[in-house]
UniProtKB/Swiss-Prot annotation:
Keywords: Membrane, NAD, NADP, Plastoquinone, Quinone, Thylakoid, Translocase, Transport. The keyword S-adenosyl-L-methionine does not apply. It catalyses: a plastoquinone + NADH + (n+1) H(+)(in) = a plastoquinol + NAD(+) + n H(+)(out); a plastoquinone + NADPH + (n+1) H(+)(in) = a plastoquinol + NADP(+) + n H(+)(out). It is a peripheral membrane protein. It is an enzyme of class 7 (translocase). It comes from Synechocystis sp. (strain ATCC 27184 / PCC 6803 / Kazusa). It holds the Pfam family NdhO. Its EC number is 7.1.1.-. This is NAD(P)H-quinone oxidoreductase subunit O. Belongs to the complex I NdhO subunit family. The keyword Translocase applies. It is found in: Cellular thylakoid membrane.
Length: 72
């Protein structure tokens, strides 16, 4: 999946992967709806994470690559 992911890619969050993650368990479990019902854009990548911008007035967020999928 990481091979398909590049800067500027449009992505969506995989609900099951994010809700069951260690990161979600370590913080507030009430995740905002926009994460699952809107597209995000990859701004930056490293080996395990992608910096994703959603088109709502919120900060960008780092998500693991297995928690997002590229849109066709």
């Amino acid at each position: 999946m990481a091979a398909k992911m590049k800067k500027g890619s449009l992505v969506r969050v995989i609900r099951a992967q994010l809700e069951n993650s260690l990161e979600a368990q370590a913080s507030d479990r009430r995740l905002p709806d926009y994460l699952f019902h809107s597209k995000g854009e990859v701004l930056d990548l490293n080996e395990e994470y992608a910096l994703v911008r959603f088109y709502v007035p919120t900060p960008n967020v780092w998500l693991r690559l297995d928690q997002i999928e590229a849109l066709a």
